[in-house]
């Protein structure tokens, strides 16, 4: 590669890094415009603003306004029909200034080459993911999150691939790659293989989930480390969060990765020149694309960078769990049929042709109240926390974000009283047939939801199935009711989220105390609601409108009178 082999370019990069060595407390829009124009790019800006549904205490923001800066390098050998993106996110507390310097150095180097067959967009976004979302919505002429932004004055071709860069230091020990995107989407596996190839060619250490590749697969340590990496990916994908700017590109069918420079205590370190060479190699390969990346897998799990688990291997695991629900529903259907027939007829013995008493119906009207009240509780869980935050903050000494979380927990806990409310309007005819019919409906409802989730986000579907299916199959009003109730509570969606947080930190080798875990759980609830309204993450509405009402049906079955 010819990147920065010239000493002049090395000194230019050193000056940029020195200029940007302090954090960018505010994006230097005018300076970025001048610098990009000086290297020969078409430079444009985009202003945007967004009012969050409630204050984001993690990033300390509520009314957000910022400016994105991007420069376009026109491909001299193309007609601006396709493009590539190199993006660097910045925020008020960002330490990503070294990545901005490397982006500008790459822009200056790419400008002097004549082999580009695609436009290259160099994008610096303000307020990290909010700026990225504003730019993507304006570029594709859509508005899915309600963000207000100015129209883009300059455009390139259809975006084929994107790379997001985050560097916290001008020297690194490894590059960590992040693939998990919004709602569990993943980039094409070929893009990840391309990154690994150029890291190996340049001698760069590349990591996945912050962990190096296992070197010894013959001993037990290698498979255990791979299992740990695999579980970390499953938990990150199941969260549905965009774990980097690349996660928002995937929504628009743009294959993207986020690369993070890690500066640890390892002895061997690499400067920005080595990172720039790897990026140049990736962009030169992507420049030769004749069509979008599609030959490799879009559904996979990664125990290591050099190994993957394809959809054909892991999907049967979810299928067998859903089969349990199907078999249990079939059993209940047969029991309902036998309960409606006479004892001889149930055994297949013909009886005398006497006038039989009227067969007792299933009592479908008795199911209307539990179904409606369960869905109403789910709708309240989705709507009321954000709508009632100001009222709660006025009457209680809490902030808006705390009011949202406390309202969520209050409505969630109020659902435990559901059986005592619904039994007042439920018909007392055929109580056994009533709970069996309700459980049959709940099993089919749960199986359909988990099946659809597993098709789009396997990690989330599998985690929910592994926790909810056993309790759902066992729940009935006969038997050890306290044991079944404890099992249902421990496998509820909220308990699954809490347990996943503890498992996540344990796999990261940063264990939590109970108090720290509870605080992290409350912060995760607030972030889940914010990400739904800010980026369109579907985990919160899925749990509130789908799985929580379904779980309440099983809770109702357990306490059926």
Per-segment meaning from a language model:
Residues 201, 236, 251, 260-351, ...:
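His/Asp/Glu-rich mid-to-C-terminal helical/loop segments that flank catalytic regions of hydrolases
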């Amino acid at each position: 590669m010819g990147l920065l082999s010239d000493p002049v370019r090395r000194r230019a990069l050193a000056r940029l890094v020195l200029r940007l060595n302090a954090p960018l407390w505010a994006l230097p829009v005018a300076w970025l415009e001048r610098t990009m124009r000086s290297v020969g790019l078409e430079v444009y800006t985009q202003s945007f603003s967004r009012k969050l549904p409630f204050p984001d205490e993690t990033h300390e923001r509520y009314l957000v306004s910022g400016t994105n800066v991007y420069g376009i390098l026109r491909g001299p050998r193309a007609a601006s029909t396709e493009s590539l993106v190199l993006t660097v996110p910045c925020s008020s507390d960002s330490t990503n200034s070294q990545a901005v310097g490397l982006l500008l150095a790459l822009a200056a180097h790419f400008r002097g080459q004549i082999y580009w067959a695609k436009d290259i967009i160099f994008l610096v976004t303000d307020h990290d993911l909010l700026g990225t979302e504003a730019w993507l919505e304006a570029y594709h002429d859509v508005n899915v999150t309600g963000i207000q932004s100015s129209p883009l004055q300059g455009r390139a071709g259809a975006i084929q691939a994107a790379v997001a860069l985050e560097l916290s230091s001008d020297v690194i020990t490894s590059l960590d790659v992040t693939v998990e995107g919004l709602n569990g989407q993943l980039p094409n596996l070929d893009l990840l293989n391309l990154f690994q190839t150029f890291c190996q060619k340049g001698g760069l250490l590349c990591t996945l989930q912050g962990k190096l590749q296992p070197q010894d697969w013959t001993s037990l340590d290698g498979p255990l480390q791979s299992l740990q990496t695999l579980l970390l990916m499953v938990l990150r994908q199941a969260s549905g969060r965009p774990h980097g700017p690349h996660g928002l590109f995937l929504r628009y069918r743009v294959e993207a990765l986020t690369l993070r420079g890690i500066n640890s205590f390892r002895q061997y370190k690499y400067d920005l020149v080595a990172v720039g060479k790897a990026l140049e190699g990736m962009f030169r390969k992507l420049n030769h694309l004749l069509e979008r990346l599609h030959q490799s897998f879009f559904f996979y799990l990664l125990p290591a960078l050099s190994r993957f688990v394809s959809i054909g291997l892991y999907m049967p695991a979810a299928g067998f769990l859903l089969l349990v629900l199907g078999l249990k529903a079939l059993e209940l259907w047969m029991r309902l049929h036998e309960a409606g027939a006479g004892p001889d007829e149930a055994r297949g013995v013909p009886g005398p042709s006497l006038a039989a008493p009227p067969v007792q119906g299933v009592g479908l009207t008795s199911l209307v109240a539990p179904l409606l009240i369960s869905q109403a509780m789910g709708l309240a869980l989705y709507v009321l926390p954000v709508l009632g935050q100001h009222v709660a903050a006025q009457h209680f000494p809490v902030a808006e974000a705390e009011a949202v979380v406390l309202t969520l927990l209050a409505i969630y806990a109020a659902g435990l009283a559901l059986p005592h409310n619904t039994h007042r309007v439920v018909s007392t005819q055929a109580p056994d047939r009533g709970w069996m019919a309700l459980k049959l409906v709940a099993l089919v409802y749960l199986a359909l939801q988990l099946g659809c989730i597993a098709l789009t986000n396997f990690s989330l579907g599998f985690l929910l199935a592994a926790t909810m299916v056993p309790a759902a199959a066992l729940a009935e009003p006969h038997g050890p009711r306290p044991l079944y109730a404890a099992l249902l509570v421990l496998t509820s969606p909220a308990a699954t989220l809490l347990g996943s947080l503890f498992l996540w930190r344990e796999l990261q080798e940063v264990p939590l105390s109970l108090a720290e875990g509870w605080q992290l759980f409350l912060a995760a609830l607030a972030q889940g609601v914010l990400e739904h309204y800010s980026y369109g993450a579907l985990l919160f509405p899925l749990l509130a409108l789908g799985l929580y009402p379904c779980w309440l049906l099983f809770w109702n079955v357990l306490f059926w009178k």
